[in-house]
Amino acid sequence: MGQKINPLSFRLGINKLHHSSWFARPQSYTAILQEDKKIRDYIFTNLLRASISRIQINRQFNQVELQLHTSRPGVIIGRSGTGIDSLKRNVKNLLSKQSQLKINIIDVTNPDIDAVLLACFISQQLESRTTFKRAVRQAIQRAQKSDIPGIKIQVSGRLNGAEIARTEWIREGRVPLQTLKADLDYATSSAYTSFGVVGVKVWIFKG
């Protein structure tokens, strides 16, 4: 089971938390859920250069708090805070009128061991026509500088423009997928190359 299931959802309530934290009445649940999706879609689409790894949405009554985990906070804040003001205005338009919005930016101090950012890095390398083995090796070397116990990276598709799609993976160290108390970070990404879409999966064991 641990080999197939998403490692993050498998560990919810043990050492992982939901990315949205709120309660709602049944009649308003779907509307709030759709708001959350609109917020995430807007931020990930319009702040591609900001290297955002996680968006945490907390709600309490009409208070909405966004926590943006990013390795490049300056891109979001902008010059003299113009970027964050613009973001606040645009996100507020996606919320109901009575909602009060607060945005907190949390700096990701070590992006090399963040699965989302590492998967995005590999995708960017593949899109710029770097060979998949070189892209994966570069990502592993960056992660290993932080002395993590293990990392696994898998890429699937028409690798290096091959006629037949295949799956390749490389693992360094231990990645215990079935140990529930293991602190595993996991992310997926897609690289849109001229030969087709290449899927990227990253598992990082942090201890």
Swiss-Prot record:
Biological processes per GO annotation: translation
**Cross-referenced InterPro entries:** KH_dom-like_a/b (IPR015946), KH_dom_type_2 (IPR004044), KH_sf_prok-type (IPR009019), Ribosomal_S3_C_sf (IPR036419), Ribosomal_uS3_bac-typ (IPR005704), Ribosomal_uS3_C (IPR001351), Ribosomal_uS3_CS (IPR018280)
The superkingdom of the source organism is Eukaryota
Which keywords does UniProt give here? Chloroplast, Plastid, Ribonucleoprotein, Ribosomal protein, RNA-binding, rRNA-binding
User: GO MF terms on file?
Assistant: rRNA binding; structural constituent of ribosome
Database matches in SUPFAM superfamilies:
Prokaryotic type KH domain (KH-domain type II), Ribosomal protein S3 C-terminal domain
Q: Which Pfam families match?
A: KH_2, Ribosomal_S3_C
User: Where, subcellularly, is it found?
Assistant: Plastid, Chloroplast
Single GO cellular component annotation?
Answer: chloroplast
Major site of localization recorded for this protein = plastid
Q: What region holds the KH type-2 domain?
A: 39-109
Q: Which HAMAP family match?
A: Ribosomal_uS3_B
Q: Which protein family is it in?
A: Belongs to the universal ribosomal protein uS3 family.
Matching PANTHER family = 30S/40S RIBOSOMAL PROTEIN S3, SMALL RIBOSOMAL SUBUNIT PROTEIN US3C
Please give the subunit comment from the record: Part of the 30S ribosomal subunit.
Q: What is this protein called?
A: Small ribosomal subunit protein uS3c
Gene designation:
rps3
